[in-house]
């Protein structure tokens, strides 16, 4: 694949930072190396010397003085080497990407540690999207991604979704406006990127079936699309075996996958990682060199100590426990919806994630949720927040069941039912 066509002019103009290059060299050099190159502060001036963390299972991890010095100092942009190695092994263990170990392939998989998954999404889109570009995006969609895309001035084409995720038939219908050969024409407005949340969708809680993933990937091959697989809820699928990722079927180097540790370990550590074609990861690294330089060293070291203590099997066991936790919350949420909202709303049961997507029997939910619900001490997110046109009326609301207890969910939906009845009698 020719990846140059996917980059915008800003990304193509980026050059490696000499200081960042030297940092990577110094980090991998033997102790005999005398470096007067980097502007590193002296670790002897840092007030933090060591730290010990107690995990919920009672075990502890200790970051001693030597490791703490590494955590608090500048480190290579791609990520702390030990964490990169562990994550690479995880991707091989879970997804077995066809191009992970094919170093000579132009689309060989590389990995970048980011400040959470959204940081990776932003860097990818800001490297590839120009004002003239057309981007395919499933609707409804994650507001964080919409917030990145809209200021870039590109044309957004919504792809419909249902309880089985993005509809590949609708995607195919959209793409019939172009011929596959148009991807070779720089002046064509043929889409070059496709964004999707394949599991536990935010806001819907729905997931793509394996059959749909295969069809979407084949359409991407036919029309030379890059797929942005935003998958923070992969491990929170409520059925097993988990549906294989798009990365696991990528033989061309056209899938850029975004993973997150926020949903499984900590949202406050702000760590995620991107797996994708090396030329794209390299461009994202250049962007990172010029901004934050690298993800938090202390967060990376802390996370690595936890992961190494677990091993891959321990990590999977932890993921399964977290999934069971949210499955129970989902069951409570659906039960409360059935109890209070039957006849007032419609929904399909989530296949994963943290959200229930409700279609209320009212013309629009915005004022009802943002004003009236607040007055009744209950909060949801109105559906327009997840739409490309956020000014258009929407009958939907998103309910998050991740934090509330069963009793709180029951009371929340009781209040929502009262709001719906009031809205039906006196529309906002």
What annotation goes with each model-predicted range?
Residues 275, 357-359, 400-402:
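Short hydrophobic/aromatic beta-strand micro-patches
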Residues 111, 319-334, 345-359, 369:
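Conserved glycine-rich beta-strand-loop-beta hairpin in the small C-terminal domain of fold type I
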Residues 59-223, 228, 234-252, 256, ...:
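Conserved core of the PLP fold type I
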Residues 251-324:
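Conserved core segment of the aminotransferase class I/II
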Residues 1-92, 375-379:
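N-terminal "arm"/small-domain region of PLP-dependent enzymes with the aminotransferase-like
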């Amino acid at each position: 694949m020719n990846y140059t066509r996917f980059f915008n002019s800003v990304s193509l103009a980026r050059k490696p930072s000499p200081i960042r290059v030297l940092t990577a060299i110094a980090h991998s050099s033997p102790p005999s190396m005398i470096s007067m190159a980097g502007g590193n502060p002296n670790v002897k001036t840092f007030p933090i010397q060591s730290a010990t963390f107690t995990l919920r299972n009672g075990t502890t991890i200790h970051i001693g003085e030597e490791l703490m010095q590494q955590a608090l100092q500048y480190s290579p942009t791609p990520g702390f080497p030990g964490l990169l190695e562990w994550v690479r092994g995880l991707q091989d263990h879970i997804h077995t990407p066809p191009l992970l170990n094919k170093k000579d392939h132009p689309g060989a998989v590389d990995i970048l540690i980011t400040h959470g998954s959204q940081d990776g999404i932003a860097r990818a889109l800001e490297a590839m999207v120009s004002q003239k570009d057309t981007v395919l995006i499933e609707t409804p969609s994650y507001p964080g991604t919409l917030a990145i895309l809209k200021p870039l001035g590109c044309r957004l084409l919504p792809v419909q979704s249902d309880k089985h995720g993005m509809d590949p038939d609708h995607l195919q219908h959209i793409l019939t406006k172009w011929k596959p050969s148009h991807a070779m024409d720089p002046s064509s407005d043929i889409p070059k990127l496709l964004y999707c949340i394949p599991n536990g969708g935010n806001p819907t809680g729905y997931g793509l079936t394996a059959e749909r993933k295969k069809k979407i990937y084949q359409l991407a091959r036919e029309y030379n699309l890059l797929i942005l697989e935003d998958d923070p809820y992969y491990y929170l699928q409520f059925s097993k075996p988990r549906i294989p990722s798009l990365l696991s079927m990528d033989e061309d180097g056209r899938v850029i996958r975004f993973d997150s540790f926020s949903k499984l370990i900590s949202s406050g550590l702000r760590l995620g990682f991107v797996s994708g074609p090396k030329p794209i990861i390299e461009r994202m690294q250049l962007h990172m060199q010029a901004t934050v330089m690298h993800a938090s060293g202390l967060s990376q070291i802390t996370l690595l100590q936890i992961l190494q203590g677990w091993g891959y099997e321990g990590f999977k066991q932890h993921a399964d426990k977290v999934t069971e936790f949210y499955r129970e919350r989902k069951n409570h949420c659906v039960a409360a919806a059935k109890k209070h909202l039957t006849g007032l709303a419609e929904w399909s049961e989530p296949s994963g994630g943290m959200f229930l997507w409700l279609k209320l029997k009212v013309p629009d939910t915005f004022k009802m949720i943002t004003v009236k619900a607040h007055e009744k001490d209950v909060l949801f997110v109105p559906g327009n927040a997840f739409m490309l046109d956020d000014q258009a009326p929407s009958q939907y609301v998103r309910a998050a069941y991740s934090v509330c207890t069963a009793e709180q969910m029951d009371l929340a939906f009781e209040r929502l039912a009262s709001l719906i009845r009031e809205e039906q009698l006196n529309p906002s």
